[in-house]
């Protein structure tokens, strides 16, 4: 089944709008001085005021927003990381396994022999970091975090001092050595499977910019390979730093392969979903052999991180009995059913060391799943949630012992006054491993608007220390998100992450805000649109009432009109004050000159003469 847009990017393709350059922007690349073979992408927003420098922003959209790039989804993206792995010389080619038969769904047309570690020399990013080795990936992400700057941004120390980072240690300038040290300590990860050479690496940790994940994936009730690839490109256009493919419908393997070969961002999955599909959807038939086979299959494809629900233990399940909403995690409910039907401990918990052994062969990172997360504010911070978190802390230590990178997943639904306790407990329990949270949603009354209530909690927990925020779309609890929902969810979460970065005192976070504030005060409407997260959306709103080109230079908008615009009035006040100040200054100079002449023109006066002089009724001294 060949899709038209997979063959070419025609103007009618679902990807046409996702691959156009951003208005008023250009794609730029930085080459680190200590690794000039690397090419790190950014976006620069060009401003209309010649006195304003271009504003550089992070850009996870890969080549899709580069007008110089040729996009061919059937060929996939350039495999630039392949040379990095080859230069290390510690991997070996394996035969791999044939792709499963998935009916008439079209497989990705190209095949590649998978790689895996060759020996016990350092291979994962964590092992390299502990050995004191700075990898290409570490240099790459340091350049990304600095937006390509060779030194700290002006005023960095003041911004750091002005923020409240709750114990985080953001540097004024991110160096590759700082990245290495954070990874070695387990406080950060670079998800980068050796079999995902198309990847543009990113770093996840609380001492770096807060990242955003977008979930995509088909279901038994809808979507297609074409739709999911389009959602991938759409999500990263609006700022998703990683993407999880949570497909549970048909052609899970083929869908994932198309996504991986065309993804410049890390891809995560929940292997349990495909394992369940392999046993016909019957959770009681799951076993280690099926799960192991699924893990290896996805490692060989190039998945960068796995959600593993190994913390759902048999003894924890009764703790959920009194909950308002029970177990709301798909993975958690599947494993709870397995545990109860067999009356055995979770086989993922029992075989966790074996899972570590598999993941370290490919440098796949753990995302330890929160299968017992609260699904309502009534259940927040309960015994079941924290019992699982304690288990995840112990499993984090086990994964580190095996040289595996780890982040830990978190809730969920948590009211605002209980959010910080989640962050504090995770840091203490999990040794400061990066926290990756779904929201949390701060109230349960927002069906259709859960991207808003969850972004409130996301901004707070991001400020408190969460390293990556998993987006929620308006369709949460209601249905499978489409492209419009993906965009709304990503933008809501980019706002939350950015707000957290500013509050933490990130040195460069506020530069974009300051630029848009100056543009707003100067009535540079096009600059305002282009500096925002959604330039097209902002322009469309302005066009609804002021559509003509002349309106883009007007000193008012339709909210206030020309006579009630506060910024226009502020300009008038400022201009008048400056003119008045000049007049007052001249009057004062004239008066003092007259006083000097009245004193006889003497430069030195005795005390009695000074006391005789007065200006505006005040003594002269």
UniProtKB/Swiss-Prot annotation:
Give the top-rank taxon of the lineage listed in the UniProt record for this protein: Bacteria
Residues bound to Zn(2+) = 413, 477
Q: Which reaction does it catalyse?
A: 5-amino-1-(5-phospho-beta-D-ribosyl)imidazole + S-adenosyl-L-methionine = 4-amino-2-methyl-5-(phosphooxymethyl)pyrimidine + CO + 5'-deoxyadenosine + formate + L-methionine + 3 H(+)
Biological process (GO) annotations held by this record are: thiamine biosynthetic process; thiamine diphosphate biosynthetic process
Its GO CC terms are: cytosol
Cofactor: how bound:
Binds 1 [4Fe-4S] cluster per subunit. The cluster is coordinated with 3 cysteines and an exchangeable S-adenosyl-L-methionine.
Report the EC number(s), separated by commas if there are several.
Answer: 4.1.99.17
Which controlled-vocabulary keywords does the entry list? 4Fe-4S, Iron, Iron-sulfur, Lyase, Metal-binding, S-adenosyl-L-methionine, Thiamine biosynthesis, Zinc
* Annotated PANTHER family: PHOSPHOMETHYLPYRIMIDINE SYNTHASE, CHLOROPLASTIC, THIAMINE BIOSYNTHESIS PROTEIN THIC
> What protein is this chain from?
Phosphomethylpyrimidine synthase
Which organism does this record belong to?
A: Rhodospirillum rubrum (strain ATCC 11170 / ATH 1.1.1 / DSM 467 / LMG 4362 / NCIMB 8255 / S1)
Biological classification of the source: Bacteria, Pseudomonadati, Pseudomonadota, Alphaproteobacteria, Rhodospirillales
């Amino acid at each position: 089944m060949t899709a038209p847009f997979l063959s070419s990017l025609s103007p009618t393709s679902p990807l046409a709008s996702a691959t156009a350059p951003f208005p008023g922007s250009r794609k730029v690349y930085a080459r680190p001085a200590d690794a000039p073979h690397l090419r790190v992408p950014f976006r620069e927003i060009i401003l209309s005021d010649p006195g304003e420098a271009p504003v550089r922003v992070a850009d996870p959209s890969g080549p899709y927003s580069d007008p110089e790039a040729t996009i061919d989804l059937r060929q996939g993206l350039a495999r630039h990381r392949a040379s990095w792995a080859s230069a290390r010389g510690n991997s070996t080619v394996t035969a791999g396994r044939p792709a499963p038969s998935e009916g008439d769904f079209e497989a990705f047309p190209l095949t590649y022999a998978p790689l895996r570690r060759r020996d016990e020399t350092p291979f994962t990013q964590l092992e390299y970091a502990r050995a004191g080795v700075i990898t290409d990936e570490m240099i790459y992400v340091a350049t990304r975090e600095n937006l390509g700057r060779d030194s700290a941004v002006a005023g960095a120390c003041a911004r750091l001092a002005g923020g409240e980072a709750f114990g985080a240690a953001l540097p004024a300038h991110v160096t590759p050595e700082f990245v290495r040290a954070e990874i070695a300590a387990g406080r950060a990860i670079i998800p980068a499977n050796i079999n995902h050479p198309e990847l543009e690496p990113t770093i996840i940790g609380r001492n770096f910019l807060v990242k955003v994940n977008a979930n995509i994936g088909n279901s038994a009730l809808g979507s297609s390979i074409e739709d999911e690839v389009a959602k991938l490109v759409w999500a990263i256009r609006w700022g998703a730093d990683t993407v999880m493919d949570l497909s549970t419908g048909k052609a899970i393997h083929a869908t994932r392969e198309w996504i991986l070969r065309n993804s410049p961002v890390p891809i995560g999955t929940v292997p349990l979903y495909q394992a369940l599909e392999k046993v016909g959807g019957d959770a009681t038939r799951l076993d280690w052999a099926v799960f192991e086979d699924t893990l290896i299959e996805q490692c060989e494809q190039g998945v960068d991180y796995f959600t593993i629900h190994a913390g759902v233990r048999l003894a924890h399940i009764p703790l959920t009995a009194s909950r308002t909403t029970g177990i709301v995690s798909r993975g958690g409910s599947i494993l709870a059913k397995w545990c109860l039907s067999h009356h055995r401990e979770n086989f993922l918990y029992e075989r966790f060391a074996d899972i570590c052994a598999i993941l370290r062969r490919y440098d796949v990172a753990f995302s330890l799943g929160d299968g017992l997360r609260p699904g309502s504010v009534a259940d927040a911070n309960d015994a079941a949630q924290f019992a699982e978190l304690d288990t995840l802390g112990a499993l984090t230590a086990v994964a580190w012992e095996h040289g595996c990178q780890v982040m830990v997943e978190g809730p969920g639904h948590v009211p605002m006054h209980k959010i910080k306790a989640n962050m504090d407990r995770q840091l203490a329990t999990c040794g400061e491993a990066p926290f990756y949270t779904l929201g949390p949603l701060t109230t349960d009354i927002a069906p259709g608007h859960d991207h808003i209530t969850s972004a409130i909690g996301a901004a707070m927990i991001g400020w408190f220390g969460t390293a990556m925020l998993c987006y929620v779309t308006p369709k949460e609890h209601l249905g499978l998100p489409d492209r419009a929902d993906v965009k709304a969810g990503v933008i809501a979460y980019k706002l939350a992450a950015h707000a957290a970065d500013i509050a933490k005192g990130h040195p460069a976070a506020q530069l974009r805000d300051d630029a848009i504030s100056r543009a707003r005060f100067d009535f540079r409407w096009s600059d305002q649109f282009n500096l925002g997260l959604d330039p097209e959306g902002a322009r469309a709103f302005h066009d609804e009432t002021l559509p003509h080109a002349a309106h883009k230079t007007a000193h008012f908008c339709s909210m206030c009109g020309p006579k009630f615009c506060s910024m226009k009035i502020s300009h008038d006040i400022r201009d008048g004050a400056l003119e008045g100040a000049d007049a007052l200054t001249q009057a004062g100079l004239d008066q003092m000159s007259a006083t000097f002449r009245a004193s006889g023109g003497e430069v030195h006066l005795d005390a009695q003469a000074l006391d005789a002089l007065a200006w505006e009724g005040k003594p002269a001294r």
